């Protein structure tokens, strides 16, 4: 993880942008069903999205008195938080990929400024792309999927550099979590 103030500033800006475009209530698509099922720990249409339902239920119920708003707004806020995490993972992936070190992943060592500038640019392009931004504005399983896959990609890059068993174990755990959210995660985990 980075302690760079630029990382935290860029992450805050992305979250702020997402907050300004957040749906105030139920959006279209599966959003209404997912919000309703997470309010009473039900099962949405197949495959059911158990991780999303549990996390959304916990977020809306436990933080409800603190955050205020309707369960729909709180579920939409959760989507914005997940896509902010996925954008932060893009930053971390680019920074890690270009970092110099003993087990360097690329043939050149990018200077710190270029590494950070590239990470901010990649984060911004990802976060503000139309599809990512759309799913950050309302409750949908894709925002959580983006965050989980972003973590898996970052951990894969980190493992390529460090060969740490702890990173591999965390990556395996994240792979399992991703499969309980969205079945398309298998496409990232298959190799």
Label every model-predicted segment:
Residues 37-41, 122-124, 167-181:
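Membrane-interface alpha helices of multi-pass inner-membrane proteins
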Residues 20, 65, 69-76, 101-112, ...:
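Aromatic- and kink-enriched transmembrane "portal" helix at the membrane-lumen/periplasm boundary
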Residues 41-69, 80-81, 88, 178, ...:
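Short hydrophobic/aromatic helix or loop-helix immediately within or flanking a transmembrane segment
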Residues 98, 103, 109-113, 136, ...:
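Membrane-interface transmembrane helices that cradle and orient dolichyl/undecaprenyl
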Residues 169-170, 184-191:
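Transmembrane-embedded, aromatic-rich helix segments that form part
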Residues 8, 77-108, 148-155:
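Transmembrane-helix motifs of polytopic, lipid-linked glycan transferases
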Residues 22-34, 44-56, 73:
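Extracytoplasmic catalytic/substrate-binding loops of multi-pass membrane glycan-assembly enzymes
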Residues 1-17, 85, 95-96, 109-120:
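Start-transfer (signal-anchor) and selected internal transmembrane alpha helices
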